[in-house]
Amino acid sequence: MKNKQFAVIGIGRFGESLVKELTRLGYEVMAIDIDEEKINDTVDIATHAVQADSMDEDTLKALGIRNFDVVIVAIGNNIQSNILTTIMLKELGVNKVVAKAQNALHGKVLEKIGADLVIYPERDMAIKLARSLVSNNFLEQINLSPTHSVMEFFTPVTLADKSLVETGLRKKMGVTVLAIRRNDDVIVAPGPEERLRKGDVIVALGSNDDLEYITNLD
């Protein structure tokens, strides 16, 4: 079992999926929800599953919430509870609080009250789905900021058989190719003379607009 400890508050579809994945990856995870039925559903998944009111300061203290490395506020059906829980966690000295936002305004409030990271699962999933539907090349994306990402995509036909310097990705667009996956091999930090081949998977860092433009090339 790995050392990092997580607590997930709010066991809806997103929260439960998060608990499952973190547990699968070998981390200790405490699942917290006020709904006994939801907690019963995670008893066999989480390291610990506790029925508790996340807006009760004494309860959070008793759970040792400040000792967790990361606490994720995944409450989605009650914005007030989501915000108040986030405030309380920061006041209790939790090292890193990740909070789920329903919309942009909710996200701004969470940022103002001190959430270390604000996430938009529904929005991000919709964006990812839309990009996969309109592009034949798009595979995966990791958002680093609102404007920049690391994206994984198949080499567009127009870039195949060209060296990286010939593609102009870095010079013209400021896009950095971090790695190329070719069959079972991974070329990390490829040189400017490395030639792209049809079927190569490119892992690149750049602005969202530039990356989206590249993935939509024929």
Language-model segments: residues:
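Cytosolic regulatory regions of ion transport systems
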Residues: 1-218
